[in-house]
Amino acid sequence: LSDALIEDTGSMYVGNDPSSTTDGANYNLAVGTTALDAITTGFSNTAVGYDALTDNTDGNRNTAIGTYALKDNTTGIVNVAVGSASLDKNTTGNSNTAVGHSSAYSLTSGSSNVSMGWKSAFTVETGNNNVIIGSESNPSTDGGSTNQIVIGQGTTGKGDNMVTIGNGDITNWTA
């Protein structure tokens, strides 16, 4: 750990020192080149991977694991991104969970969304309270979708406050 920076604030940076002043940043862990690079006052963040949470300044209690995970986050709080480029464009969104490569990639400001699967909710820019499960599955609209549950590979939601299960390949339902 000769290249680790351990601060009195309880923060540890491995791989590079942040380019910002970190006096107000407490209990953060960054592992990887430019991980948590812009941190100033954010606390209790975990960033593992190249450019993970790199633009985060004031966001708190975020977890980013993977290259570019939560890369553009600045003030968003309590987000979890696991997978390269998951929640990449999030800046101010809160309480989002994205698992899978490029999951919720374009989401910038939505809150309380769950996205699981390769490129799930990939094009969604805003939206709240959505659950999107399945590779390349998306809600009905890229902006402002609310309370949609979409399950299945390549499935597109039918509208706000609706549940959509399965794509066009489903031919039979059994109970």
Model-derived regions, located:
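Glycine- and small/polar-enriched repetitive beta-structure motifs of secreted/surface proteins
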Residues: L1-A175
